[in-house]
Amino acid sequence: MKQFYSVVLTIIIYISSQSNVVSLDCRKLNEDCSKTVFSPCCDPLSCALSTAFNGKCKACLAGGYFCWRSDECCSGTCSWLKCTNPLTDIINKLTD
C-alpha cells in the first residue's frame, strides 16, 4: 500500500511540474515553493527542493538538485532525476 501512495504522489508531482503556470498563485524568484500544484514557481523558474516539498524558486537548478526535465537544470542535463554538474562528473570519472 505504501508503494501505491508513493507512485500516486510521484505522478501528481510530475503532472504539476509539466504544466505552465501563468496564474497569480505562482511563486516568484527566491520565494518558498513545493514543486507541486499547491505552490508552484512561475515560469520559467524551477523549485530547488532542500527537503521534501520545501524549496525556493530559482532561475535554474544547480548540480545535484531533483529535476524532472533537462530545461530545469543550469547544466541543461537532468539525468536519473538529478541535475548534473559537468565539472564534478568529469572529476569523478578521472579519480575513479
Curated annotation (Swiss-Prot):
Keyword Transferase among record annotations: no
Domain observations: The presence of a 'disulfide through disulfide knot' structurally defines this protein as a knottin.
Signal sequence annotation: 1-23
Disulfide bonds: C60-C74, C67-C78, C73-C83
Assigned keywords, A-Z: Disulfide bond, Knottin, Secreted, Signal
Lineage: superkingdom: Eukaryota
Pfam families reported for this sequence: UPF0506
Record's subcellular location: Secreted
Main location: secreted
Protein name: Uncharacterized protein SJCHGC09766
UniProt cross-references to InterPro entries, sorted A to Z: UPF0506 (IPR021712)
Record-annotated membrane-spanning stretches: none
Cellular component, GO annotation: extracellular region
